[in-house]
Amino acid sequence: MTQTFIPGKDAALEDSIARFQQKLSDLGFQIEEASWLNPVPNVWSVHIRDKECALCFTNGKGATKKAALASALGEYFERLSTNYFFADFWLGETIANGPFVHYPNEKWFPLTENDDVPEGLLDDRLRAFYDPENELTGSMLIDLQSGNEDRGICGLPFTRQSDNQTVYIPMNIIGNLYVSNGMSAGNTRNEARVQGLSEVFERYVKNRIIAESISLPEIPADVLARYPAVVEAIETLEAEGFPIFAYDGSLGGQYPVICVVLFNPANGTCFASFGAHPDFGVALERTVTELLQGRGLKDLDVFTPPTFDDEEVAEHTNLETHFIDSSGLISWDLFKQDADYPFVDWNFSGTTEEEFATLMAIFNKEDKEVYIADYEHLGVYACRIIVPGMSDIYPAEDLWLANNSMGSHLRETILSLPGSEWEKEDYLNLIEQLDEEGFDDFTRVRELLGLATGSDNGWYTLRIGELKAMLALAGGDLEQALVWTEWTMEFNSSVFSPERANYYRCLQTLLLLAQEEDRQPLQYLNAFVRMYGADAVEAASAAMSGEAAFYGLQPVDSDLHAFAAHQSLLKAYEKLQRAKAAFWAK
């Protein structure tokens, strides 16, 4: 068998692919290659997924088909090893009360009487970073996955690189502020760590360049010419009508970062891609392949025009958009003829061990502490790297403003609503509680509660505003029910099934009729049945009487058996739990 070695990797692509595929099979995961793209020469991307759980998927990119597949499989292990596939979901009562929730080496810190953050969590530097005003409470740090207040706060062990001490960081903080940044998997520990550190630099420098509207130096043609495969890809894109700018993003040789920007003159938009690696050529190739990962040439019309509004470009919401799908705003200043930094033909490359030391030296120079959790329980090296002040995707204030566990205390209540028989005023009190606690009416209930509902039921599209309509119906407040029904039709009907949209049209009509004291409802029954169908009229009538206000919501138990999608997710997680238990028992 041929052996293909590429820079930055400690094993041949063929060996990595065979090993990754065998390990996944041994763990019980059936992975399929769902789609391939090769829109220009030397740019490949692939989408792979679990045949049994559609929520577990990754994308890979590379200059060759093998490189893209190895990339996707590596990312799959990265997300399995760090539990990232499950980051947005509650894992149910059984796992929440099991021997361990995340890893056997996790540590639980019971909540204190005064709700202070317990001793033993975080170090002084982290406490000062996350909570400078000393306002953080312990109950804010319950993890979404367990939602188990009785057990307390789950801390995961990280090694502080300056002195190799173990520091416990709450899973809640990791999930809320860092999401997928700094996660990596590789053939060796150093390869994985170099990849993770490179990603931290990539996102940090990208945010600085965008937020500060920095003008970057172009990479000279003679330097680009050293990488003919990249040049061929760029020339093909330009021949298709997409001007390309390739920039040195190192900010004067400080960081191993490249930026490539694509213009789409057909609609006046642009898209900036960033990549990082100690090897200049690897960083350049990654940036160009990232530009087209998961995209064909027909998919390059969804970005935004450059702007002169530097304040809007620098807003955190814009930077978050860039993290999610790179479709945020870019300043025209990026393209100024006179760059803010000179071009540097940088090179930080060496063995992966040397590259790790080189990248760590940059963090040390900037006085940034690096915390690393290494994972080997799946037979593949993986890690999660946290660099407070550099790798944060969301600001620390989100622990107060947008904590992913902020709806956990309502989960049992909301899931019990279908089939409930409360006093009418209790339903109306729940509307008041939702208002008092400041929940956005547009929030999807499944996301608030951490549910994988599948798309075949009312829970999938349910937002807080629609829930208020249902609660008002159950509480007998038809005027308030009409307000929230009309809100639902205006803001949510575009995602409804035809059946659900028809139900709401019927419900609105019946609610409007209920306000007409002089009209007799029975006079209109035949017309309503002809317009909306007997089923919709019956369902809307039952909702208005309070008999069945929660249309399309099935009852849900504490382990979420009502949701097949969630059950497939839990089955995947149980495979990981078995592997963790076996590894840590050695």
From Swiss-Prot:
One of its GO terms (cellular component) is cytosol. The lineage of its organism: Bacteria, Pseudomonadati, Pseudomonadota, Gammaproteobacteria, Enterobacterales. Disruption phenotype: Mutant shows a decrease in the ratio of methylthiolated to unmodified S12 and a decrease in transcription of a subset of genes. One of its GO terms (molecular function) is magnesium ion binding. It comes from the Bacteria. Residues 60-437 form the YcaO domain. Involved in beta-methylthiolation of ribosomal protein S12. Interacts with the ribosomal small subunit. This is Ribosomal protein S12 methylthiotransferase accessory factor YcaO.
